[in-house]
C-alpha cells in the first residue's frame, strides 16, 4: 500500500457547493464536501486519518473565509468520522443518533484490523447534535434535509 497521501481534487459542483475527491491509493479514502455560506461553512463528513483530515481542513480554510460552523457525519464509519477531532472546537457535529452510538461503541478498534493507513493520533469525537428521523439545516438560503429512512443501507445509520 502506498504511504503517501494522494493529491485530492477540489471541484465547485454548484455555487458555493464543493466536492473534495480523494483518488484511490490506500484504505480509508472517502470523498467529502462542504457548503460555503456568508456566515459559516457546513462540512459533509471528515477524512479517515489525521493527515488527511488536517489536509481537508486546510483546503476548507483556504477556500472559505467564514469558519466551519457545522460538520455532518453521514454515518459512523471511520473514513467519515475519525477526523472529527480536527474540526474547530466551536463546530457543531451532527449525525443520526445511531451514528453517534456506533462511533462511541467502535472507537478506534477498526484501525487494528487494517494495515497501511498511517492513522496519526486519532481522538474519537462523536456527533453531539443528533436526530432520529430528519433534520433541516440552512446554509444561507440553501435548505439541506438530513433524512434517515429507517431501513439499513450501507449502515444502520446513514
Q: What label would you give each PLM region?
A:
Residues 2-10:
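Short acidic, Pro/Gly- and aromatic-enriched capping/linker segments at domain boundaries
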Residues 8-9, 31-33, 129, 133-135, ...:
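Residue-level detector of beta-strand structural context in well-folded domains
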Residues 10-59:
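Conserved beta-strand hairpin/beta-sheet module of binuclear metal-dependent hydrolase folds
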Residues 13-19, 115-119, 140-146:
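Short Pro/Gly-enriched beta-strand edge/turn motifs at strand-loop
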Residues 23-24, 119-122, 126-128, 148-152:
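Short Gly/Pro-enriched turn/cap motifs at secondary-structure boundaries
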Residues 44, 74, 157:
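Active-site flanking residues adjacent to catalytic metal/cofactor-binding acidic residues
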Residues 51-54, 58-130, 134-136:
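Active-site HxH/HxHxD metal-binding segment of metal-dependent hydrolases
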Residues 134-158:
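Core dinuclear metal-dependent hydrolase active-site scaffold
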